Amino acid sequence: MFELSDWQRRAATQRFIDQALIGGRQRPAASGATFDAIDPASNRLLARVAACDAADVDAAVAAARRAFDEGPWARLAPVERKRVLLRLAELMLAHREELALLDSLNMGKPVMDAWNIDVPGAAHVFAWYAESLDKLYDQVAPTAQQTLATITRVPLGVIGAVVPWNFPLDMAAWKLAPALAAGNSVVLKPAEQSPFSALRLAELALEAGVPEGVLNVVPGLGEQAGKALGLHPEVDALVFTGSTEVGKYFMQYSAQSNLKQVWLECGGKSPNLVFADCRDLDLAAEKAAFGIFFNQGEVCSANSRLLVERSIHDEFVERLLAKARDWQPGDPLDPASRAGAIVDRRQTAGILAAIERAQGEGATLLGGGRQLTINGSDNFIEPTLFGDVRPDMQLAREEIFGPVLAISAFDSEDEAIRLANDSRYGLAASLWSDDLHRAHRVARRLNAGTVSVNTVDALDVAVPFGGGKQSGFGRDLSLPSFDKYTQLKTTWFQLR
């Protein structure tokens, strides 16, 4: 369908939006400051983007507040907001190539992953929430004969949304779709590594009919724009996907400002358990490789810990090493590449340091581990597998956010569960077993928000996504996500 040359030609002429969108207008940062947006796969400067700070966040929040208090969006009938959001989903698909290319150039992912997964997935999220709007009902409480008590969901007001760089368009959609569907106004702060698809999405939202000021985008550095959003007294709720350490800052910002609601989806160190009664070890090995090497391992729910029953350990690892060879990184614009570039030099350096530290801790390097240079960029790392990993090693405990897998053996079901749950994170887990009783037992005991049985990292917009412990709280996707963007309102009527 596409060739490398097709994507290269489009990349050569791609337009990059380099200004904030505030109140329906594109504008530079008030300070005039910019930051460089770099293609990690080539080290090419793509654009110098407005570096928003507190002054720009103030303007964006003021525009969002005016749109909410005075504009039509929050007061439209659900079916009217539905029509606008469905139109936005259609426009996203109409601009599928452009949006896919923006994310690929911006953060290094294979462009065909963005084309096949990210863009249609993000459009589907908008369409799903749009379709849900006229199918949600409020309640009437069973009160006394002379009273009527209604329980309704109402929008919160102004939502601050801070999203990461690993799935820029998808993560924006996960926050924006339910927030806008519920009638809120939003100020979106994309990661500084990947602002372009969010800025283009905001343009498309205006074209679809989202009123000016309802969706504002403030690119900028986290310690400036993100912090200002977290501290702003006119922001009613802050939703965040990113690292646990940054998530903790947003909790502090809420306490220091207006006690705004904060919803966090943070990191993970997700286990993948393979029991000896799994009959299709080849499939399990294929999925285990996908679970850690897809998107260069830059996935919050990546299955970065592999726990294998000792009786099949050696055979399974041999199969897995063969599957890992399919995930060698390549040019992200080459449709044949299954893995691309690491997002930037800082992340690359962090992954390489983790690999070196793991060897110093005594883990056995089974495969990969090398930094590669492709197209003049050294932001490429081989799929890396370590064996003999003890639970006290940093490799088993800290999120690396890269293509690095920690492999350990276990001797019993109880030991497997103990090792799996021995983590400060609780986002996701996978397990492989053909014993239905065991699958149910183990799934119930795993401390994770999502457990995938005989697959890895299962996901659908109709199913809530999120975790516990230091992976955060609250749920993205599905109907429960409306809880983050609405509040219950009780209204009493005294009847005569």
Language model features with spans:
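Hydrophobic face of amphipathic alpha-helices that form TPR/SEL1-like repeat modules
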Residues: M1-S42, A67
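Residue-level signal for inorganic ion chemistry
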Residues: G24, N43, R81, D103, ...
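Conserved C-terminal structural/oligomerization subdomain of aldehyde/semialdehyde dehydrogenase
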Residues: R44-R48, V235, Q328-P329, I355, ...
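Short, well-ordered beta-strand elements within core beta-sheets of diverse protein domains
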Residues: L46-C52, D69-W73, A161, N272-A276, ...
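Glycine-rich loop-to-alpha-helix module at the N-terminal edge of alpha/beta enzyme cores
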Residues: L46-L136
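Rossmann-like NAD(P) dinucleotide-binding subdomain of oxidoreductase/dehydrogenase enzymes
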Residues: Y137-L283, F410
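A short hydrophobic/small-residue beta-strand
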Residues: S185-V187, L365, T450
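ALDH superfamily catalytic-core signature
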Residues: A237, E245-R390, V453
